[in-house]
Design a protein with these regions (language model features):
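Bacterial Sec-exported substrate-binding components of ABC uptake systems
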Residues: 2-36, 43-96, 212-252, 372-377
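Extracytoplasmic ligand-binding site segments that recognize negatively charged/polar headgroups
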Residues: 112-116, 161-169, 179-209, 242-269, ...
Length: 377
């Protein structure tokens, strides 16, 4: 019995020791497991942080200095996150760069149709500082109080009036308040256009500068490369044409009036579109963006093609109706009888936003126009 009792005592002792060992082992396992999970979570957070940094441009951002149309040099210390954009053409560039989430506000509500339909939802969600768009109202500058109320870390403009109009905040005033600004080179920058516009370098410089400012240079290069490929596909066919083989084109901006037409000269974006597409602007000898001419001068230059340009109405049906209205004016105007483009009804169609405003859609305009010109030479 004593022997049996001692055996049971030893058995209980060994069982207790094993239980303690298992408890200690399980505790160690649990601690190790928790540590492993924590490490995974921390690694995941770090990866997410790095991914977010790459996505928003903050990862490894080095301060840069960028120079704009006015020669204003702005130091960008970190990618802007609360941007105010004062003109639709520059807003569109940001949208092509997938930077719509950085826009805190726009100046005036964009005119319907002025931006691609694909961006409509994003644009509708952006607050306007100068109120709703009103047809014929002209540019409404953003008052100082309204602009500063959104605490912008960057202000972007496309026209000098964005900063110079009465009531607008100047770039100097913005700088005094510690807010950098940038006036685009490709929209209406006279100082940047010192020779005829025959390409899209100014657009590419703006896109590249915006890519640097926001820390997304790779996105900018993809957008630029997409434009280059479209342009190259046309230049491969039209680039070798002699001037005499290029159809002459009168770019007619219908919405600017019909009594005395505005003739885009060689400093205007549409000149680059026409030249790249394989045509010749009949007013390409004018070293200015626009000049008012009489219809008799259009008749004297006798264009082979009239490029009808209208403001985008926001839908294909509305645009077609407006193009048809413009073409009806041309074919019924007594002043234009005998003009080759009119008698042959050789009309090409482009919306103003892709043809006459420097931007990403210029490359699409080139492709569209080239198709029409190839059968009109």
């Amino acid at each position: 019995m004593h022997v049996l009792a001692r055996w049971f005592d030893r058995r209980r002792s060994r069982t207790a020791d094993v239980s303690r060992d298992r408890a200690g082992h399980n505790g160690t396992v649990r601690v190790a497991a928790v540590a492993a999970v924590a490490a995974v979570l921390l690694a995941g957070c770090a990866d997410a942080s790095r991914s977010q940094g790459r996505a928003d441009g903050t990862s490894g951002f080095t301060p840069i200095t960028v120079t704009d149309c006015n020669g204003v040099e702005s130091v960008i210390k970190s990618p802007p996150k609360r941007v105010v954009v004062l003109t639709p053409s520059v807003l569109e560039m940001l949208l092509w760069l997938d930077l719509g989430d950085r826009v805190a506000a726009i100046g005036q509500e964009p005119r319907p149709g002025s931006l691609p339909q694909r961006f409509a939802e994003q644009v509708a969600a952006i607050p306007s500082l100068s109120g709703k768009y009103t047809a014929g109202s002209g540019y409404k500058p953003v008052p100082r109080e309204e602009l500063l109320s959104v605490e912008p870390d960057l202000v972007l403009g496309g026209f000098g009036s964005n900063f110079d109009a009465a009531g607008a905040m100047s770039q100097k005033e913005l700088a005094t308040d510690g807010i950098p600004s940038y006036l685009a080179l490709s929209t209406a920058c006279r100082s940047a256009v010192t020779a005829p516009r025959t390409g899209f370098d100014l657009v590419w410089r703006d896109v590249e500068n915006l890519g640097r400012i926001f820390g997304v240079p790779d996105r900018a290069q993809r957008v630029i490369e997409g434009m280059r490929q479209k342009v190259a596909s046309v230049r491969a066919k039209a680039g070798g044409l002699k001037d005499t083989a290029r159809p002459t084109v009168f770019p007619f901006e219908y919405d600017e009036g019909t009594t005395t037409p505005y003739a885009p000269g060689n400093r205007q974006a549409v000149n680059a579109v026409i030249e790249t597409a394989g045509g010749r602007n009949v007013f390409g000898d004018r070293d200015e963006a626009y000049t008012k001419v009489g219809w008799e001068e259009v008749v004297a230059r006798d264009p082979q093609v009239i490029l009808v340009i209208v403001y985008d109405r926001g839908s294909p049906a509305a645009n077609d109706a407006h193009f048809a209205e413009a073409e009806k004016f041309l074919v019924t105007s007594p002043a234009l009888r005998g003009v080759r483009a009119v008698t042959g009804k050789r009309f090409a169609r482009l919306v103003y936003e892709s043809a006459s405003v420097g931007g990403v859609r210029n490359a699409d305009a080139v492709v569209e126009l080239a198709g029409r010109l190839s059968s009109a030479g």
